[in-house]
Curated annotation (Swiss-Prot):
Its EC number is 7.5.2.1. Keywords: ATP-binding, Cell inner membrane, Cell membrane, Membrane, Nucleotide-binding, Sugar transport, Translocase, Transport. It comes from Photorhabdus laumondii subsp. laumondii (strain DSM 15139 / CIP 105565 / TT01) (Photorhabdus luminescens subsp. laumondii). InterPro entries: AAA+_ATPase, ABC_transporter-like_ATP-bd, ABC_transporter-like_CS, ABC_transpr_MalK-like, ABC_transpr_MalK/UgpC-like, Mo/tungstate-bd_C_term_dom, NA-bd_OB-fold, OB_MalK-like. This is Maltose/maltodextrin import ATP-binding protein MalK. It comes from the Bacteria. One of its GO terms (molecular function) is ATP hydrolysis activity.
Length: 369
């Protein structure tokens, strides 16, 4: 196992800055996930750790040894690519052992290692097949197996599940999680899929335009996002936002006026919030309540009803602001499109974002955080 440290690491191509002053300490055996929209620099950071991209400025350390000028082959890292990168003319066994053969390992050692990893990944019965005879999930396991055979101290995975269908993604996600628990190796994983990030990571690094927006445990990011970008990116369906106005403040609460002119106090810190300022209220779809059990309500018109079997998602337009909210309940909700629908807003579940998009610290304690 190895630790990985990035100290003020930046990457630029000419005048174009891709990653800006990244500071991150990854502990031995930790599973870190980089997540963010396309073009945010997450794969670039992974490639710098691997040695496939030069570091423009800053220091990259593995086990407290500076790696900026160390060749990729000597860094002790293994990388799994999005495209699998398997040799089509080689068998599964030959693909998995390719790196060991290049390194001049003994034939007996190669055979033993390939057999061990193949059994771990349930590939033993496929060792004589070529990639074209494998399913997408099997090819991905071969790509992972090839990396495991080399026994790296740090695993780098660059969107390894993006080419798989939905069912296979779930299966492979579980397998990668089990693999990490079994090996206890440091894993750094890149994805644009926040579901993968939430389910796999010990900690998530959210990137926005080359900057680190927030680092934290999955539930910490979900319940206590530091800004509106993180709040909207983490969670599916994403957080609802409403324009509101601050009407009063206290040390540990802020009073806001909703679009329907109702006033409510939110249990958030009032630092940086001024009376009269236009701010944003955020609330997750599953935290909205049926109107009969809520004191604060909003009325809207049903636009779309999505019945998913295990849950219902109701898309509601608030006429006063011509803005849609998503209401999510873990059951069947029978409501017609075009009808009037009233939802409840529990104050302790609400988020408040200042005019600059930063979050007011929530004071309600969420379980598991």
């Amino acid at each position: 196992m190895s630790s990985v440290t990035l100290h003020n690491v930046s990457k630029a191509y000419g005048e174009t800055i891709i990653s800006k002053n990244i500071n991150l300490e990854i502990q031995e055996g930790e599973f870190i996930v980089f997540v963010g929209p396309s073009g945010c620099g997450k794969s670039t950071i992974l490639r710098m750790i691997a040695g496939l991209e030069d570091v423009t400025s800053g220091d990259l350390l593995i086990n407290n040894i500076r790696m900026n000028d160390v060749p990729p082959a000597k860094r002790g890292v293994g990388m799994v690519f999005q495209s699998y990168a398997l040799y089509p003319h080689l068998s599964v066994a030959d693909n998995m052992s390719f790196g060991m053969k290049l390194a001049g390992a003994k034939k007996s050692d190669i055979q033993q290692r390939v057999k061990q990893i193949a059994e771990m990944l349930q590939l033993a019965h496929l060792l004589d097949r070529r990639p074209k005879a494998l399913s997408g999930g099997q090819r991905q396991r071969v790509a992972i197996g090839r990396t495991l055979v080399a026994e790296p101290s740090v695993f780098l995975l660059d969107e390894p599940l993006s080419n798989l269908d939905a069912a296979l993604r779930v299966q492979m996600r579980i397998e990668i999680s089990r693999l990490h628990k079994r090996l206890q190796r440091t894993m750094i994983y890149v994805t644009h899929d926040q579901v993968e990030a939430m389910t796999l990571a010990d900690r998530i690094v959210v990137l926005d335009g080359g900057d680190v927006a927030q680092i934290g445990k999955p539930l910490e990011l979900y319940h206590y996002p530091v800004n509106r970008f993180v709040a909207s990116f983490i969670g599916s369906p994403k957080m609802n936002f409403l324009p509101v106005k601050v009407t009063a403040t206290a040390i540990d609460q802020v009073q806001i006026t909703l679009p329907n002119r109702q006033q409510i106090w939110l249990p958030v810190e009032s630092k940086g919030v001024k009376v009269g300022s236009n701010v944003s209220l955020g609330i997750r779809p599953e935290h909205l309540l049926p109107s009969d059990i809520a004191d604060v309500t909003l009325e809207g018109i049903v636009q779309v009803v999505e019945q998913l079997g295990n849950e219902t998602q109701v898309h509601i337009e608030i006429p006063a602001i011509h803005q849609n909210l998503v209401y999510r309940q873990p059951d069947v909700v029978l409501v017609e499109e075009g009808s009037t629908f009233t939802i409840g807003l529990p104050p302790h579940r609400c988020h408040l974002f200042r005019e600059d998009g930063t979050a007011c610290q929530r004071l309600h304690e969420e379980p598991g955080v």
